[in-house]
Amino acid sequence: EELPDSKDRAXPLSASKXISPYMKEAIPMSIPPVIDFNKPFLIIXY
């Protein structure tokens, strides 16, 4: 499901675009608070 979020469409936040689909798969796996330094966006975004 792709919601028309202005944040994902922002330019400057193009990084979240990529991360957006990754977060959807990471959210169910991120039930335990795991800090991934390689993907700090997961926390922001979360």
From Swiss-Prot:
Organism encoding this protein: Notamacropus eugenii (Tammar wallaby)
GO biological process terms held by the UniProt record: acute-phase response
Post-translational modification, as annotated: N-glycosylated; contains bi- and triantennary glycans with a bisecting N-acetylglucosamine and fucose residue.
Keyword Iron-sulfur: no
Site (Reactive bond): 29-30
Tissue specificity as recorded in UniProt: Plasma.
Domain of life: Eukaryota
Domain-related comment: The reactive center loop (RCL) extends out from the body of the protein and directs binding to the target protease. The protease cleaves the serpin at the reactive site within the RCL, establishing a covalent linkage between the serpin reactive site and the active site of the protease. The resulting inactive serpin-protease complex is highly stable.
Protein name (record): Alpha-1-antiproteinase
Residue numbers of Phosphoserine PTMs: 30
Location in or out of the cell: Secreted
Keyword Ion transport: no
Any single Gene Ontology cellular-component annotation: extracellular region
Record keywords, A-Z: Acute phase, Glycoprotein, Phosphoprotein, Protease inhibitor, Secreted, Serine protease inhibitor
Family stated for the protein in its record: Belongs to the serpin family.
GO molecular function: serine-type endopeptidase inhibitor activity
